[in-house]
Structures are given as C-alpha cells and as structure tokens.
Amino acid sequence: MLDVFIRQQATKILVGDTHQQIYGWRNAVNSLENTDFQELRLSASFRFSPQIATLAHKILLWKKHLGQEPDVKLFGRGKNTANKVKATIARTNLGLLLRAIEFIKENKNIKHIYFEGNLNSYTYADDGASLYDVLNLQNGKKRLVRDPIIKQMSSVDDLEEYIKQTDDVQLGLMLEIVKEYGNEIPKILQDLKDKHVANEDKHKAQMIFSTVHRCKGMEYDSVQLVNDFVGEERLKVMVDKDDADPSRLNEEINLLYVAVTRTRNHLYIPENLVPDGIGPTPSLHILKTEKKEKDSNTETDRAIRSYLKEKTQRSSVNEASKQSYQKWTKELDAELLQMHDEGIPTRVMSTHFNRTTGGIRSRLKKLNGW
C-alpha cells in the first residue's frame, strides 16, 4: 500500500506520530520510518493541557532504557474545561472488564455505558482463551472448554499451578474473576450488555470503556487509567530479561503515551505509571497505589493485586484501619467527592486515601446524604 502511495504522480503528504505505533503484533509497519520525505514537526496539540503534554513527553523519554535517544518536542495548547464525556482506558481486555464490573456493581443507578469495539471481545485474553473456559473448568464441565491449554487441565488447581509457572497475567486475571464472581458471571455480563448503548447513542453513556488499542484517535473530557500498563520500574526489569524484545517494549511505552493523550481535560493515573518529577495539578490526578512495583513480584502477582477488591487491601488493612478514624478535611472531602463523581472504584479510593473501603463508603454516605 505504501508503495502504491509513493508512486502517485502528485504532491504527497504523510501525517502521523511515530510514537503511536501500537499494532506491531499485527505486523503493522510505521510508514513514516520507511520514507525519505522532508520532515516537518507538528509539536503542539490543542487537545490537552501543558501538564498532560509534559507527562506524555517524560513517558516517551523512558525509551532511553531501550538505547534510544528520543528527540521529542510536545506542547499542550488545550484549554478545554468540559467534564461530560468520561472514559476508562485499560491496557488489556480483562483489566477493562474487571473495572467495568466494579463500576456497575458500585453504581446501581447507572443506566448507560458504552464499550469501544465489540463488548463480547473483552471476555477473551489475547491468546483466545475465554472467561467461560475457566468458569466451565471450575464447574467441572471440561467438555465445554474450547481453549486447548485450559482443556489440558484436570482442575482449577492445575490451572493455578500453570499460571504460576508461566507468569501468564491474563489467564491469572481470568481465574481470579471466576473465583471472585463464579456463576454470577453470566448475569454480570448480561447486565453490561443491557446497559451498553448503540453507537448512535454513545453520547448518552455515563462511562465509556475501552482498551487503548480501540480508542486510538479518540478523545474524552476525563480519562482514568486502569493500573495494567507498564510503568518505568517494571520496564527496567523487563529490559534486563534474557528474552527481552525491544520492539515490544517500545510499543508498551507507546501504549501508555497514547492512553494519557486521549484526555481533553482531566486525567486520573496510578502513581506507579507517573514519571519522576511529575506532580498533581488541577487536571492531572495522581492516584496513590499500595506501593511502587517491586522486582521480587511476578507480573501475575502485580496484575491480580491491582484489580481485586478486598484482596488488594490485605497488606495495608491495619494502617488503613487507623486512618479510617482520622479526621477528614474539607480538601479531602472535595477530592473524595470528585473522584466518586468520576466513577473511580471504592477499592482505588480506599488505597489512595489509605482508609478502609468501609470508611470510604461511610464518608460518601454522609457527604451525599444517602
């Protein structure tokens, strides 16, 4: 296709962003790097603010860990103050599905949501394994299991051992979803489908859900990121592995860059995905996490701990219990209400404020007069 384009007898202009190359797994190539045209920089964006531009720029500088010297100039000229269109963006299908489940279970009054792309695809891992395969294995219905790997397992215990041996993040998440919700899963998925609006009614959605691949080119007033992207600490660990794939790691950086630049106004981002030297601003909200990623934890352990509800609180429950009885200030109340209005899960707010989930719910009940 590129060859056909280049051979046209006309003035030719290629417009793109090298750092938004995220489809290498589909064997997509970056056309900008395969031509010798004169290069003109478009370094200003009128979508997002200077603070978001600085964040995005510093994320791209992580490519130095891959031996690159990114020559990037990025300026934010956006002045949007609207906060109507809200989106949750994840790196993986299952990370997004977990957040969507949390959202509708915690917000019973939500009537309309929207998924970019096919909703059914979010129940699958990248390798094709289905959430229903794991559920059928747990229920002893192996005849209904289609995935060849899961079909080899005689029980959930075998699957759990396989996950530990292979460090399969997405399969680990599937197993934990099944453990958490069990036979309630079909009803939950049906609830998601019932609330999902058609394309022409997307403007009615109270929350839009998307993986970063599906929302490339999109923009939203407010964006919250699920904590399943690769941060700098994890990137440095992955670079040092014997089987490290520089092109894949380059795309992992690009994925986070694309995700943070979807916002027109507010961005809620876990602190372990924030480069050093970046602090919160009125539009950039840094969500505290349990702790920075540690080399001693496997990817599966980190991913599972990022999503599960009460399980994520075990390591800090004693300290959180102490904090639950400390005085709330006007500033903290305002931040809590804003995060709740944005649809941030109670689990995430609990970690951010270092309080129990019960303490968060109790405070919200008082502030909202429920």
Task: Write out the residue ranges for each language-model feature.
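Short, solvent-exposed alpha-helical "recognition" segments
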Residues: 313-316, 364-370
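Short alpha-helical "recognition helix" segments of helix-turn-helix
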Residues: 348-351
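C-terminal accessory regions
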Residues: 179-210, 216-222, 227-302
